């Protein structure tokens, strides 16, 4: 039986010809039998691909041969090509869609003017040091708000955003101005959203901004469920969520009966299909697999 794996990585680096990189990446993945999603822009690459482990290793090795991708931090997880419906390789204005391509500055070293990178151990050191001085680090979730329903850092601020496009409006709303003089640690799944988010926050006057290097994925690999993270990690493929150990808490609640769950399901109304948390019992019936307050659609 073949051993399969999924890799997640990104790299911010100037790309003179994004379309040429797109063609190369598509040809490489097709040759190796990989599926997944790859986004390329003038500012870099954002990729999640899966397949047979030998093919994935060859893909990573070949991708790193591109000048700007030598130092990409690759995160490995269980899964394979079957977790993605197809291979998608696209060129876009941004490799993560905040709707602010003009605000981001990228050079050979990555994003210019973003937050200070902290490895998981360094994050703990910062939290402890501030605690000793009577201060506290504010955790700021850089994901879509619904993702935090099943997992987040303890006492984290979770902005009211449906997509990353909503972050600029949210930051400009004034809701978080009281945090501008506090140490703020941004976090997201693999680190890419915080590369941009931390830069946007610095641009808006947040004085001490950090970003979790490698994101929740790297933190979970380091501390499992013995650190400051609680719950499951939402992922954008057929797996839907993953846990870092058997000791993971289930913090999500079914919208119908409040039973603990980490499983998102689409509303059974064909014109709605909103992704919502349901327990197995409520998800088993079309009558209960519906938005309890009525569908917005």
From Swiss-Prot:
Active-site residues annotated for this sequence: 188 (cysteine persulfide intermediate)
Keywords annotated in UniProt: Oxidoreductase, tRNA processing
Record-linked InterPro entries: Rhodanese-like_dom, Rhodanese-like_dom_sf, Rhodanese_C, TrhO, TRHO_N
Enzyme class at the top of the EC tree: oxidoreductase
GO molecular function: oxidoreductase activity, acting on paired donors, with incorporation or reduction of molecular oxygen
Keyword Cell membrane tagged: no
Function: Catalyzes oxygen-dependent 5-hydroxyuridine (ho5U) modification at position 34 in tRNAs.
Family: Belongs to the TrhO family.
Protein name, entry field: tRNA uridine(34) hydroxylase
Species whose genome carries this gene: Pseudarthrobacter chlorophenolicus (strain ATCC 700700 / DSM 12829 / CIP 107037 / JCM 12360 / KCTC 9906 / NCIMB 13794 / A6)
Lineage per the UniProt record: Bacteria, Bacillati, Actinomycetota, Actinomycetes, Micrococcales
């Amino acid at each position: 039986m073949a051993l399969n794996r999924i890799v997640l990585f990104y790299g911010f680096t100037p790309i003179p010809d994004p379309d040429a990189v797109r063609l190369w990446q598509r040809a490489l993945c097709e040759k190796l039998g990989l599926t997944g999603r790859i986004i390329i822009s003038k500012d870099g690459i954002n990729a999640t691909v899966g397949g047979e482990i030998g093919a994935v290793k060859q893909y990573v090795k070949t991708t790193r041969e591109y000048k700007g991708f030598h130092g990409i931090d690759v995160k490995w997880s269980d899964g394979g090509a079957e977790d993605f419906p197809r291979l998608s390789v696209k060129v876009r204005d941004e490799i993560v869609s905040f709707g602010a391509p003009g605000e981001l500055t990228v050079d050979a070293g990555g994003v210019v003017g973003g937050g200070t990178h902290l490895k998981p151990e360094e994050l703990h050191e910062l939290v402890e040091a501030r605690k000793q001085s009577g201060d506290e680090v504010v955790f700021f979730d850089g994901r879509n708000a619904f993702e935090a329903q099943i997992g987040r850092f303890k006492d984290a601020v979770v902005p009211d955003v449906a997509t990353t496009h909503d972050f600029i409006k949210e930051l400009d709303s004034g809701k978080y101005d009281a945090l501008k003089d506090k140490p703020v640690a941004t976090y997201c799944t693999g680190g890419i959203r915080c590369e941009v988010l931390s830069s946007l926050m610095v641009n808006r006057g947040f004085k001490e901004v950090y970003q979790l290097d490698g994101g929740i994925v790297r933190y979970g690999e380091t501390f499992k469920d013995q650190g400051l993270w609680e719950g499951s990690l939402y992922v954008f493929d057929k797996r839907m969520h993953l846990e870092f150990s058997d000791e993971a808490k289930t913090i999500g609640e079914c919208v119908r009966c409040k039973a603990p769950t980490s499983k998102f399901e689409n509303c059974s109304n064909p014109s709605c299909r909103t992704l919502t948390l349901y327990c197995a019992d409520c998800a088993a019936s079309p009558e209960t697999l519906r938005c309890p307050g009525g569908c917005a659609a």
